[in-house]
Amino acid sequence: MIEAWGMTMEKSMYIKIEEHMLACMNDGAHDCQHIYRVLYHALEIAKDYDVDREVLIAAALLHDIGREAQFRDPRLDHATVGADLAYDYLKKIGWAEDKAQHVKACIATHRFRAESPPVSMEAKILYDSDKLDATGLLGIARTIVYKGIVMQPLYNVDDEGNVLEEDDDDHQHSFFQEYNFKLKKLYNRFFTEKATMIA
C-alpha cells in the first residue's frame, strides 16, 4: 500500500490509474509532466485539509484524459468528457460508486471556464492545483505550446492592424486573448489559501 500523505491506496491500483493516464496523454501542453505537477500541488495543498486523498489522487491523475476527444471535436468540453471517462474507468477497475462519482465531480469542475464551480474540498484542491500549473512563466509557455498544437495565432489584428484584446466572431482565439481572459485573472480565482500563496 502507498501510505504517503495519509492515504492507503493499494500500490497496484495507483499504478493502474497512472498507466491509464499515461496511455491517454499525447498533448505537449497537457502531458504527463503537467499531470505530475498537478498531483504534487494537490498533495501539498491537501496537507492543510481533511480530504479523501484517494479521490484527490485519482482525480489529479485522470483530470485531462478528455483532452483527445476535445482535440477531435473542439465543441466538446474536455472536463465533461474526462469526468465521464474517469468514472467509467474507475468503475471498471472496481472502485465504489460513491468514490467514482466524487472523482467524476472533481474532474467535471476543474476547468477555468466551467459553469459549475467546484464544491467539495477535493474538487477545489484539484482546480487550484491545475490552475497553479497555468501561472507564471511555465503557464505562459504551456499556453503557447497548446496554441501551436491547435493552430491558433499568438494574436489577432483588426483591419487597421491593431491587436485585438478580446475574441470576436471574425477571428480565431489567440494566445493574447487567452492571456487576457484567463492567465492574468488566475491569481484571484483560487479557492485555497495555500494555492494563493504558492502562486
Language model features with spans:
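Amphipathic alpha-helical segments within well-ordered protein domains
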Residues: 22, 39, 43, 66, ...
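His-Asp-centered metal-binding catalytic motifs of divalent-metal-dependent phosphohydrolases/nucleases
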Residues: 53-72, 78, 82, 86, ...
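A short, mixed-charge helix-start or loop-turn motif at secondary-structure junctions
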Residues: 20-25, 68-71
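Short gly/ser-rich anion-binding loops that grip negatively charged ligand groups
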Residues: 28, 72-76, 93
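Hydrophobic, well-structured mid-protein blocks that either form specific transmembrane helices
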Residues: 86-127
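Divalent metal-dependent phosphate-bond-processing catalytic cores, especially two-metal-ion Mg2+/Mn2+ enzymes
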Residues: 12, 24-51, 62, 115-199
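An amphipathic alpha-helix signature
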Residues: 14-18, 39, 79, 83-87, ...
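Short, Lys/Arg-enriched N-terminal segments with co-localized hydrophobic residues
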Residues: 1-8
